[in-house]
Regions:
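Conserved AMP-binding/adenylate-forming core of the ANL superfamily
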Residues: 45, 49-104, 121-126, 186-196, ...
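Gly/Ser/Thr-rich phosphate-binding loop
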Residues: 189, 276-277, 305-310, 319-385, ...
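Conserved ATP/PPi-binding loop(s) of AMP-dependent carboxylate-activating enzymes
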Residues: 392-396, 407-441, 480, 576
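Conserved AMP-binding/adenylation subdomain of ANL enzymes
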Residues: 236-255, 265-306, 321
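AMP-binding/adenylate-forming catalytic core of the ANL superfamily
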Residues: 116-141, 156, 301, 308, ...
Length: 598
């Protein structure tokens, strides 16, 4: 890890574990560690970023030298607009090379990056940019999605009418004539014109190690989104070097591919993991199953991906196209696969392990969160694999599983996931909201970080995440996680996805409600509902007989494909579903509301 000035103290907890400071006195920058370190080495001329559009004929490759030159030009252009240290800069961009250029350009000048999901509508953009008081936004006219231009600039324009802090908008022309792009004089700047003539070589800002680098929002169960603050030393010290290198064996020779969005944590992983180690990154615009259902596997094949990341929901969706689709492609370049974002059910885990890992490749399950900037549990090359399990605790974080009083629970018992030690990746409070930070993580069990996940360790020492702890279902005094029942439902082969929630019951305390997405070709009728209900009874016992089985075409999901059980539960109970800005498919909420209104 590179510093301009070495730190004088590794860890300072004099104000309490909640306010731990790392690498005190040290100065550094994410760009120093991810790009500048490779100058003058053989890595500098090697490919860093490989991009493919929805049309596979649209491809672009940038070496580290070429990529860094673009970063410097954009960084200099931003400085020419008066943007500098501590200013917040929004990124409202899809999966393009320029998105990653922007990521590093903002950090290079010491500004604070605010990634925004490229599928956001105006309201979530307004909420985030206003909370962070953004000075500038980097955006694009639009992006291709399933062969159709998706307009982004006009969405941003609508939002900025209610964001007075934004003084500058830098606009990339990607769609060209396919998208009209009105420009506001004095505020909007054409990207290409702005960077033309700028220097391709400029110094990187020397920042305090714990200075804010990234302001990334995550949804709360209630209220506005929570602004998590990553520092220049934090994300690299946790997710990149500790989790993905020491635990998950990322190497300089690897080509990384994890199809997501810069608006989520995986976007920063894609930017920083390969660049820190001198590896390469594959970026793909669009969706994994267009222009054909084998696109995702073809990308792995054509670009010789060695390190593949997936979300369980992605695999559930690709499974529907049949085994023969994935088997058409040569995936022999793969060395390691990893997954994150949500709990696995057994059927898709086994499908992926058989058809992609060929029952021999490491399949490393990782889980953490935006708030911790890294992993709480991880897979490694040295621990056994079991469907949906994690081999080890995150290093050094004091990960434990406890009961309501904070006492550790035994093997086979379900408890609350907590972290007892300060973690270099922890959010540096929540953006300008210390009280909410303490309430959210530290006051349930004083002096212990309560993460909000429901976890278990089995008799062999493997760990499992069983859903959010606010998803916990307690039926007749028995506590269970939703994924246990969801595994039974998807195991019937009749449904591709399921969300299980607990709802109040006068006798049992909670009753089970199952919301399921039938597989293509399976009739969504009363017979299916009865079959699914019986599957739960057979697997869990009669006390878990569902009160209701609802059949829908889709479940509410975030962009990184987490199923939002809290939203399903709130809609079912007639409560406000809270912040929905991270949903990729709000129409799923409307469908569920419609079915419940009948």
């Amino acid at each position: 890890f590179r510093f301009y000035q070495p730190y004088t103290q590794m860890l300072d907890t004099s104000r309490g574990i909640e306010w731990a400071q790392w690498c005190v006195g040290g100065t550094t920058n994410i760009v120093l560690n991810c790009l500048d370190r490779h100058r003058g080495t053989p890595v500098w001329e090697q490919p860093f970023l490989v991009w493919e559009g929805e049309d596979p004929k649209n491809r672009k490759t940038l070496s580290y030298r070429e990529f860094d030159a673009e970063v410097c030009r954009l960084a200099a252009a931003l400085q020419s607009l008066g943007i500098g240290r501590g200013d917040r800069v929004g990124l409202y961009l899809p999966n393009l090379p320029e998105t990653f250029v922007a990521f590093f350009a903002v950090l290079k000048i010491g500004a604070v990056l605010m990634p925004l999901f490229s599928g956001f509508g105006p309201q979530p953009i307004i909420a985030r940019l206003n909370d962070g008081e953004a000075k500038a936004v980097l955006t694009v006219d639009g992006t291709w999605r399933r062969g159709t231009p998706g307009i982004m600039k006009s969405v941003l324009d609508e939002a900025l009418a209610e964001v007075p802090s934004v003084q500058h908008v830098v606009v990339l022309r990607h769609l060209g004539e396919a998208s009209p792009c009105p420009m506001t004089p004095g505020r909007d700047h054409d990207w290409a014109s702005l960077v033309a003539g700028q220097t391709h070589d400029m110094p990187t800002a020397e920042m305090a190690a714990d200075a804010p680098a990234v302001l990334l929002y995550t949804s709360g169960t209630t209220g506005k989104p929570k602004g998590c603050v990553w520092t220049h030393v934090g994300f690299l010290g946790s997710m990149v070097t500790r989790d993905m290198h020491i635990c998950a064996d990322f190497k300089p020779s690897d080509r990384f591919f994890f199809m997501s969005d810069m608006g989520w944590m995986v976007g920063a992983m894609c930017a920083c993991i390969p660049s820190y180690f001198g590896g390469s990154l594959l970026v793909a615009e669009g969706t994994p199953d267009f222009p054909d259902t084998g696109r995702f596997w073809r990308l792995v094949q054509d670009h010789k991906v060695t390190y593949l990341g997936v979300a369980p929901t992605l695999i559930r969706s690709l499974m529907r196209y049949g085994d023969e689709e994935v088997e058409r492609y040569d995936l022999s370049s793969l060395r390691i696969t990893c997954s994150g974002g949500e709990a696995w059910t057994e059927a898709p885990w086994r499908w992926f392990f058989k058809h992609v890992c060929k029952e021999r490749l490491p399949f490393l399950n990782i889980v953490g969160g935006t708030e911790v900037g890294g992993c709480n549990f991880t897979g490694t090359l040295h621990h056994p694999l079991r469907p949906g399990s994690f081999g080890a605790r995150g290093l050094g974080a004091g990960v434990d599983i406890v009961d309501d009083s904070g006492q550790p629970v035994g093997a086979g018992q379900v408890g609350e996931l907590v972290l007892r030690n300060p973690n270099i990746g922890f959010t540096k409070s929540l953006w300008r909201d210390d009280e909410r930070y303490l309430d959210s993580y530290w006051r349930t069990l004083p002096g212990v970080w309560v993460h909000g996940d429901f976890a278990m360790r089995d008799a062999d020492g493997l760990f499992y995440i069983l859903g959010r702890s606010d998803d916990t279902i307690k039926v007749s005094g028995k506590r269970t996680g939703p994924s246990e029942i969801e595994t039974l439902l998807t195991g019937t082969g009749k449904v591709s996805e399921a969300a299980v929630i607990g709802v109040p019951d006068e006798i049992k305390g909670s009753a089970i409600v199952c919301v399921c997405v039938p597989m293509p070709g399976v009739a969504a009728d009363a017979a299916l509902q009865a079959e699914l209900s019986q599957a739960v009874v057979h697997g869990m016992g009669t006390s878990y007989r569902p009160r209701q089985v609802l059949l829908v075409s889709d479940l509410p999901k975030t962009r990184n494909m987490k199923i939002m059980r809290r939203v399903v539960r709130a809609v079912y109970r007639g409560d406000s579903p809270g912040d929905l800005s991270s949903l990729v498919n709000p129409e799923a909420v409307a469908e569920l509301q419609g079915k419940l209104a009948r």
